[in-house]
Regions:
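A residue-level signal for conserved active-site and pocket-lining positions in enzyme catalytic cores
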Residues: 15, 88, 146
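Short cysteine-rich loop/turn motifs with clustered Cys
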Residues: 80-108, 128-131
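Histidine-centered nuclease catalytic patch
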Residues: 100-129, 138-154
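A generic structural motif
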Residues: 14, 121, 134-135
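Secondary-structure junction/capping motif
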Residues: 21-22, 84, 96, 115, ...
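Residues within alpha-helical segments
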Residues: 27, 131-132
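Short helix-coil boundary/hinge micro-motifs
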Residues: 1-80, 85, 154-190
């Protein structure tokens, strides 16, 4: 496995997602004794130096999912993920909310349902993915003013959905773990 692209799913001790770690960051948690449990496959074994007394070489084996010491005090259902175009387009499966066409990320734009100039906010519930022609056609109007109904409703991703949206190279065991926690009806399961 190519260790340069492997990301380790970091969870609190009680299983709440905290983020994605590089292999090097994960090794630091292991070396500090902060990993209290692990799941998933072993993704890498790193070798260190030799013990001067025993002559044994140190090694750390890293699993794809680690629980680190500490228990999150945040209710995961209150967390609102950071809005980025990459996550927005992935949430909407690279489909325009107005015409339904599938497009590459470079051909999509963040479209504000209620335009900023008309009091709309740059929030998950007010943005959808739009192809350039639809975004230009809609312009500074509301969808009903130009007879452009939304084909799907925007939503705020859950913490578990956000973890999926944040990583393009999720290992099968990590995806299985995250998918088991997705809200019923999540678009990320289809």
């Amino acid at each position: 496995m190519e260790t340069a692209v492997v990301q380790i799913l970091k969870l609190t001790g009680n299983g709440i997602p905290q983020g994605w770690l590089t292999l090097e960051e994960a090794v630091l948690h292991y070396a500090a004794g902060e990993v209290i449990w692990e799941l998933g496959a072993e993704v890498a074994t790193l070798h260190g130096g030799y013990n001067a007394v025993s002559g044994k070489r140190s090694q750390i084996t890293v699993n794809s999912i680690v629980g680190v010491a500490g228990f999150g005090k945040v209710n995961p259902f209150d967390v609102v993920p950071l809005l980025t175009n990459d996550k927005l387009f992935r949430r909407d499966k690279f489909h325009c909310a107005y015409c339904g066409d599938h497009a590459h990320a470079s051909d999509l734009e963040r479209e504000h349902i209620v335009p900023i100039s008309r009091g709309g906010r740059d929030k998950w519930l007010n943005v959808v993915s739009s192809c350039r022609p639809c975004n230009q056609r809609k312009g500074n109007r509301l969808p009903h003013e130009i007879n452009m109904p939304l084909l799907y409703a925007p939503y705020v991703p859950s913490l578990w959905e956000d973890m999926i949206l944040r990583n393009r190279r999720i290992l099968a065991d990590q995806m299985e773990f995250l998918s088991a926690k997705l809200p019923r009806g999540s678009r990320l399961t289809a």
